[in-house]
Amino acid sequence: MFLLLPFDSLIVSLLGISLTVLFTLLLVFIIVPAVFGVSFGIRKLYMKTLLKIFAWATLRMERGAKEKNHQLYKPYTNGIIAKDPTSLEEEIKEIRRSGSSKALDNTPEFELSDIFYFCRKGMETIMDDEVTKRFSAEELESWNLLSRTNYNFQYISLRLTVLWGLGVLIRYCLLLSLRIALAFTGISLLVVGTTMVGYLPNGRFKEFLSKHVHLMCYRICVRALTAIITYHDRKNRPRNGGICVANHTSPIDVIILASDGYYAMVGQVHGGLMGVIQRAMVKACPHVWFERSEVKDRHLVARRLTEHVQDKSKLPILIFPEGTCINNTSVMMFKKGSFEIGATVYPVAIKYDPQFGDAFWNSSKYGMVTYLLRMMTSWAIVCSVWYLPPMTRQAEEDAVQFANRVKSAIARQGGLVDLLWDGGLKREKVKDTFKEEQQKLYSKMIVGNHEDRSRS
């Protein structure tokens, strides 16, 4: 029989007491408040403390740069090129005028100087285009003590180095272990809870339990990211029979929204852990999952969504029409499919604060596990959510126009740039139609002016 020495027994006892105290604190201050949807204000106090530390760190670096007669690196938030919103015709007129050529109205034919316009536009696009920079992390104006966000290493003092090292220990040893425990708790409760609810007969009681199980588990998962969320205009929250559309930055957008509302999810059937979660969730709630072979069938997808929204007793569908993650500086083209089925649309704008951690998932650079590790080793996830008034398709609108109107409303409320480009350009080459569009504009300018002159 194996006997413990007195010293070994003491260590085991202390370890057991420590784990008991840790679990008790976890239960009392995090899990129980998450279950009931209340907060003790600890996270907001934590956020205010971090802001003061970031401000102090920035002042220290500015002082170090000043002593060396240098300036700190500052990102160009509006781009590195000053661009005036002028048309192709106006710019070519200006080029011909400055080159002492004849005016465009007098000479509709091709001029050799016209190529300077296209050369300049090409060089501007290579240096600073408005599309590809939306697929990389947003640059910060100040350092947040995460090494991956600092461009001013040479101005770090000894005090800042010690503070950064202390931050690494806190994030990777204390916060990471705590967050993993919370995430495991939330996911386990979601799978077990929804599976058990799924065995109940359909009715109000099952719907009541399903709603509160989902909310409880998502709120625990929100705590696992130390997410500090501010919800605005809750009176506009999506209702049954509608579609909730939002800008898309990260997979955690789902958790952010689902911790404050009850939604039917739409997505492709997965395997592994995600597949286990999906199968458990659909037992308790009418989510809309598609097989891989069905996703490409637009008519089948539209029919399934239409059938869902026509039943006013079913939950609002949560959809991200961009179809890919954007870095939360802009909103890109909304796919029209969600706007063709004639349901009431409830727009939602989500804006993250990158000071505490970059929520953007660059899926072409990081896998899901790496991304979640980055999230759980950040300081926090801070964001604001705005519920906009419901919108319906007008009689004279087609689906594309309706989608653009909803997109503009989301961009305006969230302080994001409204772009017409397709987010699919993250992985695909630019279509020839985009290239041909510039050729058509130039041809129309030349040929059109020539035809007008011939008629007169």
Curated annotation (Swiss-Prot):
Residues 1-37 form the signal peptide. SUPFAM superfamilies: Glycerol-3-phosphate (1)-acyltransferase. Keywords: Acyltransferase, Endoplasmic reticulum, Glycoprotein, Lipid biosynthesis, Lipid metabolism, Membrane, Phospholipid biosynthesis, Phospholipid metabolism, Signal, Transferase, Transmembrane, Transmembrane helix. It catalyses: sn-glycerol 3-phosphate + an acyl-CoA = a 1-acyl-sn-glycero-3-phosphate + CoA; dodecanoyl-CoA + sn-glycerol 3-phosphate = 1-dodecanoyl-sn-glycerol 3-phosphate + CoA; sn-glycerol 3-phosphate + hexadecanoyl-CoA = 1-hexadecanoyl-sn-glycero-3-phosphate + CoA; sn-glycerol 3-phosphate + octadecanoyl-CoA = 1-octadecanoyl-sn-glycero-3-phosphate + CoA. A motif (HXXXXD motif) lies at residues 248-253. It is a multi-pass membrane protein. InterPro entries: LPCAT1-like (IPR045252), Plipid/glycerol_acylTrfase (IPR002123). One of its GO terms (cellular component) is endoplasmic reticulum membrane. Pathway: Phospholipid metabolism; CDP-diacylglycerol biosynthesis; CDP-diacylglycerol from sn-glycerol 3-phosphate: step 1/3. GO terms for molecular function: glycerol-3-phosphate O-acyltransferase activity. Its main location: endoplasmic reticulum. It comes from the Eukaryota. Its EC number is 2.3.1.15. It is an enzyme of class 2 (transferase). The chain crosses the membrane at residues 156-176, 180-200. One of its GO terms (biological process) is CDP-diacylglycerol biosynthetic process. Converts glycerol-3-phosphate to 1-acyl-sn-glycerol-3-phosphate (lysophosphatidic acid or LPA) by incorporating an acyl moiety at the sn-1 position of the glycerol backbone. Active against both saturated and unsaturated long-chain fatty acyl-CoAs. Protects cells against lipotoxicity. The HXXXXD motif is essential for acyltransferase activity and may constitute the binding site for the phosphate moiety of the glycerol-3-phosphate. Belongs to the 1-acyl-sn-glycerol-3-phosphate acyltransferase family. This is Glycerol-3-phosphate acyltransferase 4. The lineage of its organism: Eukaryota, Metazoa, Chordata, Craniata, Vertebrata. The gene is GPAT4.
